[in-house]
């Protein structure tokens, strides 16, 4: 397999260090996600371009050259992208002919911040972003009328398509959901895969609140294979139904909203990460406020899992 991975890497112009890293990551991903997804993982490797920023660049600058990034109401804002360690993005090239929109092609990119790709931190980031790319491949993009749908794992985004005065296709956000849930499960997955690669105990390096809830959902509910299938194939409804069990409530939808609130606090914490160690009282208070809010929201999420466990027990 290493020969195939290196062959794909060299065909895309990757250097030896990146190829060496991919030779560690790809087998570990197959081990974690399952042999049945081997071909899908290799296909994503072949069709995704990995770019590492230069020392004077950030992820936002590189990504913005590929696709103009507009500020909207997304949970992840431009400022979050500017300080991100990495981003996975599927860029649709959409055209309009005779009033009908269509996807001409999809360009798949992973952009990593400047750093040593063989370092543990960069390996974990690449695992995280490659997992996002993997979960946004199958059944993930379509156009219906003037509505563009895109999916990355559990994340579902609906955008309205229109033309500007120059005839350029414009996408306007309508709705976005399940961001916190997806980041939690993806962080759980990247911690396991990174542990397989390094042989060290796994730990959550990012999205800790959502990741803790994701781990508890997998362990306590026992639907790990079903949730991985939902993320990789887009069969979200099946996972949603088994999560809800016999409950008359939409526990999945409720948990999704809870986790979106948790992830907002995660981003808020990350934006203020440089305040750690500050002697200023207002800085200490701000960090304490964010951490307390995150802790409250995590408690709400745990109550939701308790309900899901109860509904599972009551399934006839």
Where are these regions (language model features)?
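Fold-level signature of zinc-dependent metallopeptidase catalytic domains
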Residues: 1-19
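Non-Sec secretion/translocation targeting segments of pathogen effectors
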Residues: 1-3, 186, 311-316
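Hydrophobic/aromatic interaction determinants used to assemble and anchor large protein complexes
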Residues: 12, 21-29, 140-141
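Charged, low-complexity interaction regions
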Residues: 13, 35-39, 201, 280-283
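Hydrophobic (often cysteine-bearing) scaffold residues that line and stabilize catalytic clefts
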Residues: 18, 22, 123, 178, ...
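Active-site scaffold of zinc-dependent metalloenzymes
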Residues: 49, 59-160, 167
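Post-HExxH zinc-binding segment in Zn-dependent metallohydrolases
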Residues: 147-212, 216, 220
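Pan-zinc metallopeptidase signature
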Residues: 201-316
């Amino acid at each position: 397999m290493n020969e195939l991975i290196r062959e794909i890497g060299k065909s895309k112009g990757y250097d030896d260090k990146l190829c060496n890293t991919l030779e560690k990551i790809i087998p570990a991903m197959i081990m974690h996600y399952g042999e049945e997804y081997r071909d899908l993982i290799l296909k994503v490797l072949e069709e995704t371009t990995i770019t590492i920023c230069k020392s004077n660049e950030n992820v936002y600058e590189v990504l913005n050259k590929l696709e103009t990034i507009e500020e909207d109401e997304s949970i992840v804002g431009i400022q979050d992208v500017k300080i991100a360690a990495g981003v996975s993005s599927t860029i649709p090239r959409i055209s309009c002919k005779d009033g009908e929109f269509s996807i001409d092609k999809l360009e798949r990119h992973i952009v990593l911040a400047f750093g040593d790709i063989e370092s543990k931190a960069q390996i974990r980031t690449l695992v995280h972003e490659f997992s996002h790319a993997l979960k946004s491949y199958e059944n993930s993009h379509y156009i219906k009328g003037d509505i563009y749908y895109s999916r990355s794992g559990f994340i579902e985004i609906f955008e309205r398509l229109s033309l500007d005065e120059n005839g350029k296709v414009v996408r306007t956000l309508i709705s976005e959901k399940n961001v916190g849930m997806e980041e939690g499960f993806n962080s759980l997955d990247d911690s396991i895969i990174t542990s397989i690669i390094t042989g060290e105990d796994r730990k959550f390096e990012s999205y800790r609140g959502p990741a803790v809830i994701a781990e508890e959902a997998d362990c306590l509910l026992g639907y790990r294979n079903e949730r991985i299938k939902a993320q990789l194939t887009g069969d979200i409804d099946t996972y949603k139904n088994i999560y809800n069990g016999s409950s008359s409530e939409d526990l999945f939808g409720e948990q999704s909203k809870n986790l979106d609130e948790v992830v907002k606090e995660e981003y808020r914490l990350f934006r203020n990460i440089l305040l750690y160690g500050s002697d200023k009282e207002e800085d200490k208070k701000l960090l304490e406020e964010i951490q307390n809010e995150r802790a409250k929201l995590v408690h709400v999420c745990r109550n939701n899992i308790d309900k899901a466990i109860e509904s599972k027990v009551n399934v006839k």
